[in-house]
Amino acid sequence: MHLTRILSLPALAVLTCGVALGQASLPHAPGARVVAISQPSERGNEPSIAVNPRSPNQIVAVFQGNAKAAYSTDSARTFTRAEGTVPDDWRVAGDVSTTFDNKGHAFLCYLAFDRLGTPYYWAHGAGRNGIFVRRSMDGGKTWEQNAVAVKAWPTGHEPNMQYEDMPRIFADNAPKSPYAGHLYVGWIEWQLDKSIMLFARSSDAGRTWSTPIRISTHAGLPRDDNGSLVGFIGTVGPDGTIYVVWSDGGTIAFTSSRDGGRTFAPSRRIIETGPPYFGDVAGVSRVMGFPQVGVDWRGGKRGGKVYITWSDYRNGDIDVFAASSLDHGKTWSKPVRVNSDSLHDGRDQFFQWMAVDPVTGAVYVQFYDRRDDPANRATRETLARSTDGGKTFTNYAWTDSSFTGRQAFLGDYTWLTAYDNRVYGIWAESVPVSDTTHTAPGRPPREGTVVYVGTADFSGMH
C-alpha cells in the first residue's frame, strides 16, 4: 500500500504504512507505521523519543521548535500535542531529549538561550543560557510549570560566562542497578579557549541536580566545528555502570562510571572515525556523524555487551558503522558496516541513531538512506536490526516515499528507542511550504520540515 501522510493538530492522526517497494529490494519493516507530529510551518527538527518501561504503550516525543512535545497512549499509533513545555521566559529553546524513569515519570531536557555568541564560537559574546529539565507525572500529558536548572547563566552578565550546549538526558532503569531511578545529563560547555564535556546527576527524580563535573580528560577546540568535542550520549548497563561516548576530533571518546556518576574514569579515544562534521551533503545544510552507545541488559554470553554506532567517510561516501565490547569498553571489535548497499557506490547513509532493546537484546539502527538515487539526493528512512550481537545487520525499508531537500536544516540528530520487539524512531523530513514569513526579500520561500515517528513490530521474528 502507499504511505499516506496525514497532519492533524492537536490530535495527530496515524499515517498508515504497508510499505510497498521501499528502498528498492529491501524487506519492509514489519508492522511499519509513520505518524506526523508537527506541521511544516513549525520547521521541527532535532527530535527525541522515549517509551515508558512501566507502561510501554505510553510514548513521549519531543522536538526542537522551542521544546515542543507530543504524547501517545496507544503505542505511537496516534499522538496528541502537549501544552506547557515551551519556556516563555527564554527567546529560544532546543537541543531537546526525553526519557522515562523507572517510576514512569517523563522528563524533557533542553537548552534555552536569548542569543548566540559569535557564529560557531559560541562562548564569545554569549547571552544568558542554560540547561533545564521539566517533569511530567502522567506520561507526557501535562508538564510541571517550573523547569529545574541543571546549569544556567540566568542574567547574561556573569563573569567568565560560558555557553552550555547539546544536553542529553537518560535514566537508570536497570532493575538490578544500585542506582535505579537516577537521572543523568551530559552536555558540551563552550569556553573561550576550549570545549569540554560536563555531567550532572539527580537522585530525587529530577527535583535537584548535582554540581556539574568535567568528564572529558582531553579538551577540544572552542569552535563548533571539526576539532571540538561534540555529541554527548550516555547509557546505563545492567549493573548501573554508566557508559558515555562523544566525538573528539577524528575519534570517538569513551568513559564510564561505576559509582552512579559521582566519578568517571579518564576519558580515552577508542575508535578512529574521521571528523564528525560532514560538508557537501547535497540538500542538507549540515550533517553530523557523532556516536551513540547502548548496552544489552540480558544475562548470558552477551549480557552487558556495549555497542557503539557512528557514521563516517572511510569508504568515500557516508556509511554507518557499529562496534562492540564484552569487557566494559576496555577493548572493541572491528567496525561492522550497518548499511547493506554496495560498497563505494557513492550514495550516503547518515544521521544514524541506535537503540538496544532491553528485553530482547536486539540492536537497532536507523538512518537516512540514499541508496536508491544515483544522484545521491532522494532520501528515505531505513531501519537496521541485529540479533547476533552486532555481527550482521538486516536492513528494512521504513518509508516508501523519498524527500529531496534544498539545503534543509534537519537538525544535528534523530532518535530511536526500542522495547520488547517494538521499535520507535523519530526524524525530520523537508517539505515544500508556502509560508514566507521568515523568508529574506528576493529569496525563495524556506522549505518546511515535518517531524515523523516511525514504528515497527518484530514480535515473533528471530
Language-model segments: which ranges?
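Bacterial N-terminal signal peptides
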Residues: 8-18
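Positively charged n-region of N-terminal signal peptides that target proteins for export
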Residues: 1-6
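Extracellular, repeat-based ectodomains that mediate carbohydrate processing or recognition
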Residues: 23-462
